[in-house]
Amino acid sequence: MFGVTDDYAKIIMKKLFLTLFVAFATAVLLWACSSSNRVVRFPLVGASNTRMLVFEKVELTDTATVLTVRGFNDPEHWIKVSPSIHLVAQNKEYELIGSKGVEPGKELFMPEDGDSCFTLIFEPLPNACSEFDFIDADAKNGWRMYGIDLTGKMDVANPTGLPRELKYTSKEASDTPEYAYTFGETTVNIHLMGYREGCVTDMVFPVNSMFEGQRSIDVEIDPATGTGSVTFMQYGTGCAFPVVNGCGYGQFFIAPNETVDLYVNLAYINQTLQYNYENYKNLAIKGCWTKGSVYDALNNQDSEDVIVLPDSLLIEEFIRYDMTADEFTGALIDFYRAVCEHAHAQKSGSWAKEICKADAFNTCLIFLNQDFRRW
């Protein structure tokens, strides 16, 4: 009797072993297939010289690298994909071999919403590739997008190059220093995080102050290091805006007589563009940080506390050229109320909400005191 039971147990063990072996082999096979065929949605971009493109999807197979691209411009304007555009990964170039929805070398005119979608097909990238660059080197101002991440591990809140001590600041608005009613020489040392040679064509530095209004300061960036420095006379606390390649990278406050290090996150622009497509994600990342200013705590709020307005809450969505004075005033009030409601609905600190509302109020004042039809 026991002998029969032992034989039966051996049969059961063999069947169990065979089942486990088949399951393991299947898992290995599936893993091998998936390792050579990957899909990355909305990959993060380390640095870019354009705000006309967002990569909606990257598909990596053994035969091709397929990019689903969103292209932007004003309605009835166009963009052009160069036939010489290529990818760069691990110091090797991968050529364009096909396209859908766009013909390389010819204008692609924008629809009424200014948002187009097309597909670019390149030679296959290596399986071990963790990032790649998207380069049009032949055109003078051709697209250059660097460090396109394929791992999903890029730290959007703390980019490479950001000093450790700037990664945490208070969220309490009571820590804000008073307005500085003084004057003196201010120096701002600029560090472009994620910089690659060729990704920055120009940088300007608009500064707003109570006594001088707005003035713009040109910044010369060292092409080898991505750093620069500006010195200027300042009257009272100012609000400054780093503008790289015509795109704003946030704002920060500075006081006269300060020497401040400014860290600009070049990944900011492309990531905020993704906000239009992935509203379920928190893409309200920061554009810049400061070190050495009395306003550091205010300038360096956590990335999740920076409130980015969706396109539906931009001032242009509320006003029209043909409005009467009363209609125009009412539209500005509606704009301010809508922004306040949006700010209060966010899970952000008190600073972020107050700054968001103050920015909206300031926008209303600007439009009330200037003829926006001339803009």
Regions inferred by a protein language model and the residue ranges of each:
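Bacterial Sec-dependent N-terminal signal peptides
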Residues: 1-39
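Short, ordered beta-strand-loop transition motifs
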Residues: 17-20, 59-63, 112, 221-224
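Conserved functional micro-motifs across diverse proteins
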Residues: 33-161
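Short, flexible beta-strand-to-coil junctions
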Residues: 138, 246, 362-366
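A non-transmembrane, solvent-exposed segment enriched in polar/low-complexity residues
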Residues: 149-350
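Extended amphipathic alpha-helical segments with heptad-repeat/coiled-coil character used for oligomerization
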Residues: 356-375
